[in-house]
Each structure stands twice: as C-alpha cells, then as structure tokens.
Amino acid sequence: MNNEETFYQAMRRQGVTRRSFLKYCSLAATSLGLGAGMAPKIAWALENKPRIPVVWIHGLECTCCTESFIRSAHPLAKDVILSLISLDYDDTLMAAAGTQAEEVFEDIITQYNGKYILAVEGNPPLGEQGMFCISSGRPFIEKLKRAAAGASAIIAWGTCASWGCVQAARPNPTQATPIDKVITDKPIIKVPGCPPIPDVMSAIITYMVTFDRLPDVDRMGRPLMFYGQRIHDKCYRRAHFDAGEFVQSWDDDAARKGYCLYKMGCKGPTTYNACSSTRWNDGVSFPIQSGHGCLGCAENGFWDRGSFYSRVVDIPQMGTHSTADTVGLTALGVVAAAVGVHAVASSVDQRRRHNQQPTETEHQPGNEDKQA
C-alpha cells in the first residue's frame, strides 16, 4: 500500500465526492463526541496527513475483536482499512499467509520504525517460556516485543489484551498476561470489552489519526470518551432502578414490563463502557435492551467474580456520575446508601404485593352479604 497517500486522496480515488467527504468528517466528529465544530479540523487532517501504517498481531484470543471491528458502521471498516490507515499486516484479514506474511511483517516494522501503530489482539502466555502460543514458529511474546520496539503507540484491543480475560481465569495455567505487564516503555491505550464495540474501535483510530496522539484516558488507561461512565448511568432501565422496581425472575411480570435487571445479576452498575449510549449493531440494541443483564465483560477480573446471575453486593466502583478515577474515595458511603435503597425498595415492593392480596375476612363464608 502507498502510505504517502492521504485519506482524502484515497477516498477521491474511490469516487467519493467532496460533499460526501465532509459529511463523513462531521459524522466522525459526532461519533467522537467532539461536536460538529471539530469537523473542519478532522477534514484538514485527513486531507493533509499521510495514512498511518498499522501492524495488527494476535496472541491468545478468539478473534472476536477483529470480527467486531469489521462490522463497524461509523466509520465503515472498509473506509478505515482502505483509506484512513494502511493496515499492512494482519494475519487474519490479509491475503498473504505463512512465510510471505511474515516477510511483510519484517518489512513494515523495519521500513516504518518508530512510525507505525501496533494493534494487539489477545495476550501473551508466559508459562513454559511462552510455548502455549506460537506465531511464525516462535513464542508470541517474542513477536510482541519485536513489534512493540518500533511502534509509536500501542492499542490493546479487547479484554484479552487489556486485562487477560478468560485465559487468565484462576488458576491461569498458561500465565496469560495483559500486554501492559510485558511492554512498559510504550504508550498503551486499552479498549476493553469481549469484544469492544465496533464503532468505538473505529473512532479510536480516527482520533489518533486526526490529532496525532492518544485520547485522554483514565487511571487504568481506557479512553474517557467511551469509558468515562458506567453502563448503568445511561441505561434506559435506570428509572426502574431508582424506583426500586426489579425483575425477580425471568418470567415474572416485571420482566415483561422491562424493569431493572440488577437483581438478576446485571453488572451495569460496576461496568465502564459505552454500550448503553453507543449500542451495538449500528446502534440497534445492547444486551440489557435485549432482556439480559450486563456481564461486565469490559471490567478487569469479570471472569473470576462468580455467576453472571448473582446480584452484585460489593460494588467497588460505585458512584452515580463518577469516573473510575474518582469513585474510590466515595465507594464505601455509596455502597452503604445503595444497600439502604435496595432494602427500602424491597420492603415497599413486598408491602405493595401484600396490599394487593385479598384479606382473610374477604374470603370468609357469608361475608359477601355483609359487604352488600
């Protein structure tokens, strides 16, 4: 690919009009939460900056991040791959394989040393000297370190690369390890989720290309624009949570009415992600809207925290409109308040059900005549 070609030149070559290009820039600004006023700056960057070479490598993973990325709609994955960046190496998507693919890998990291972005999907297992994950005939950890050495920045795609995910579940026999525990001398942005939201993945790349830097992150390395609030904060069922209206079983009347799924194990109150605002499948829905509680797949350690259907009792990151950076100091008080709210809500709910039941007097023989 010609990396000196700009994004705008690539789009024009594909027959995209100037008007459509500007509409694309406006949409990109909106998806990044920057407002329409930033569209001209994005347009200037995409008109003048050459496409950035990207090397995308895979460790221990299931490829769900790639599957998610190619379904991006804002912007389209094809626009990102063919125009916005130069995805020169991805052994899942590229046509080449085997020795030919590895020659491309070596050429890119040598020719663009210090200029390319390294995207990592999956994590390196450190057990048995890395032999649990072999890439190109050698342990993946070696490939990761070699690729990271010349990268300008690193994107950790998904919960596997960010936290370890199910591969790191106790007792973690392969010693699966998040990449930031192995690569410590490069800027790393974490985009957790199993998988991450497609449009979030595309937006992160668009931001980096436009502004030549990583987006602002929280103390855990996640971009604040997408991981600054909990799913619970913008969930459309939040009003039912505040009112103490909860689903008690999957087939009860509350479930049919769309009440809060907290008591069914929903991890939305402790999970930072954009599911409730960005949604999935081009904004169609997200798990809670489909009737199932959040699994908390974007959070560190979700795989070792018991059943998906167990109610969250200990909420270490509680805070109504706080980010992960600020909730720690207030978590204890908020947890106590939350316990009180649920106790009151449950009491009110039980009293309401009791009042709806007929009394014993109403069922006594002959009582109908007395009431008449």
Swiss-Prot record:
Which leading EC class covers this enzyme?
oxidoreductase
Query: Could you list which ranges are Cytoplasmic topological domains?
Result: 347-372
Residues annotated for [4Fe-4S] cluster 1 binding in this entry:
62, 65, 160, 194
Binding site residues for [4Fe-4S] cluster 2: 232, 235, 260, 266
Q: How is the cofactor bound?
A: Binds 2 [4Fe-4S] clusters. Binds 1 [3Fe-4S] cluster.
List its EC numbers. 1.12.99.6
Listed binding positions for [3Fe-4S] cluster are 275, 294, 297
- Cellular component GO terms, alphabetically? [Ni-Fe] hydrogenase complex; ferredoxin hydrogenase complex; plasma membrane
| Cofactors that this protein relies on | [4Fe-4S] cluster; [3Fe-4S] cluster
Annotated PROSITE patterns:
TAT
Q: How is it modified after translation?
A: Predicted to be exported by the Tat system. The position of the signal peptide cleavage has not been experimentally proven.
Recorded hits in InterPro entries, A to Z, give: Cytochrome-c3_hydrogenase_C (IPR027394), NADH_UbQ_OxRdtase-like_20kDa (IPR006137), NiFe-Hase_small_C_sf (IPR037148), NiFe_Hase_small_N_sf (IPR037024), NiFe_hydrogenase_ssu (IPR001821), TAT_signal (IPR006311), TAT_signal_bac_arc (IPR019546)
Q: Could you tell me which residue ranges are on the Periplasmic side of the membrane?
A: 46-325
Cell compartments where the protein resides:
Cell inner membrane
Q: Where is the composition biased (Basic and acidic residues)?
A: 360-372
Residue ranges, annotated region (Disordered): 346-372
Any idea which UniProt keywords this protein has?
Answer: 3Fe-4S, 4Fe-4S, Cell inner membrane, Cell membrane, Iron, Iron-sulfur, Membrane, Metal-binding, Oxidoreductase, Signal, Transmembrane, Transmembrane helix
How the protein sits in the membrane? Single-pass type I membrane protein
Subunit structure comment from the entry: Heterodimer of a large and a small subunit.
How is this protein named in the record? Hydrogenase-1 small chain
- Please state the gene responsible for encoding this protein: hyaA
